């Protein structure tokens, strides 16, 4: 399925859940093949952009750019996720698949084949395209591909509305390029975030929309992030397309989750680790003060600690770590650290238990182990390790 392989994997994962063969499934795609050979192969097709930009559905679109990525989704049956208090980002209501069949060339898409996959997704979902507010398209930025994709979408969507465009269309490839085997997963993750954050995401690098969108009865190109206003009579709905190089087509129907808010998991450890990084001590003070003045409920304390790990930069010049039992303990230790910075004793006076800080640039570690991935050895491998 090539570029549609991650949504092909998703279809198999959904079958596993529906059949009861699995209770939790991880599905997605991985691509890290942007070596010179990959570019040489793609350069033999009209797919690559000579200007080095991917501009889906734009008048000046001239091709795609290759990207790399990993996209993995955790899937469960809704009843199981609600029972276990899992955080639910969105619902998958349907998925449709199919093939273009015979065409003029292996990389030439057929709108009719894509339309079949789209229609199958909505039949499975149990609702029509007129209730969909956002389509995260395959949108490679190639003239032929974008034109064919919009033609396929119009075959399904046109005549379902009141004649005025109601559905936003876009592509994450304008931001990250074409991640090939991971492309479908990237598009799906973007659409899921759009639903959970109630925001219509932008497609960037658009000067003037393509001609096929100017007179569209169904679609408009969203070029800036804005609140997602939806009808009160139904939840927000989005769809995702992913089309393969050889004609494999997949379309996923997503829906906003409107059920009860997931219960935060209980704290496992008596203390939590908070980590901070900045380029200057003033920057560190600003970060610490922000945390001191943030009211954190007991059930959210672990989540706040985890969020600091996501923004921590290990190679920053100024780094600090605090181990705290609760918000009061965290505020006291952060205040002690701020006090030392402001009095000029930072780095010389003892900080006390549970507080660690450094202004020394981190050193590059030595090689300790070597994992070849194949179990193979080479001459002098042990000597290389000994000298490292």
Language-model regions, residue ranges each:
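Condensing-enzyme catalytic core of the thiolase-fold
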Residues: 1-268, 286
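Flexible catalytic loop/linker elements that gate and position reactive groups at enzyme active sites
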Residues: 109-124, 213, 233-367, 378-384
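Short amphipathic alpha-helix adjacent to the substrate-entry channel of hydrolases
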Residues: 386-388
């Amino acid at each position: 399925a090539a570029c549609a392989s991650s949504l092909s994997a998703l279809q198999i994962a959904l079958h596993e859940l529906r059949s009861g063969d699995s209770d939790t499934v991880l599905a997605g795609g991985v691509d890290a093949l942007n070596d010179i050979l990959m570019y040489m192969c793609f350069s033999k097709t009209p797919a690559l952009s000579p200007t080095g930009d991917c501009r889906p559905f734009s008048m000046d679109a001239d091709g795609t750019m290759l990207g790399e990525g990993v996209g993995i989704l955790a899937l469960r049956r809704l009843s199981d996720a609600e029972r276990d208090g899992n955080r639910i980002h969105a619902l998958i209501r349907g998925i449709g698949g199919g093939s273009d069949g015979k065409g003029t060339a292996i990389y030439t898409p057929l709108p009719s084949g894509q339309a079949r996959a789209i229609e199958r997704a909505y039949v499975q979902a149990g609702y029509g395209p007129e209730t969909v507010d956002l389509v995260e398209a395959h949108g490679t930025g190639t003239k032929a591909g974008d034109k064919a994709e919009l033609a396929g979408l119009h075959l399904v969507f046109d005549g379902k509305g009141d004649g005025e465009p109601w559905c936003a269309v876009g592509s994450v490839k304008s931001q990250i390029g074409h991640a090939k085997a991971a492309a479908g997963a990237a598009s799906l993750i973007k659409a899921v975030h759009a639903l959970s954050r109630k925001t219509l995401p932008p497609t960037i690098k658009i000067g003037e929309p393509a001609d096929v969108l100017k007179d569209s009865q169904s679609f408009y190109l969203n070029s800036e992030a804005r609140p997602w206003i939806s009808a009160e009579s139904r939840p927000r709905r989005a769809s995702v397309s992913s089309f393969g190089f050889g004609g494999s087509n997949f379309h996923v129907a997503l829906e906003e989750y409107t059920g009860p808010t997931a219960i935060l998991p209980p704290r496992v450890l008596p203390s939590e680790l908070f980590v901070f990084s900045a380029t200057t001590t003033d920057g560190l003070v600003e970060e610490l003060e922000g945390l001191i003045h943030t009211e954190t409920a007991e059930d959210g304390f672990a989540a706040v600690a985890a969020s600091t790990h996501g923004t921590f930069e290990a190679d920053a010049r100024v780094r600090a770590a605090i181990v705290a039992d609760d918000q009061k303990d965290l505020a006291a230790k952060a205040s002690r650290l701020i006090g030392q910075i402001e009095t000029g004793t930072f780095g010389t006076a003892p900080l006390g238990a549970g507080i660690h800080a450094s202004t020394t640039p981190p050193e590059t570690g030595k090689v300790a182990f070597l994992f070849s991935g194949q179990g193979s050895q080479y001459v002098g491998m042990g000597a290389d390790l000994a000298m490292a």
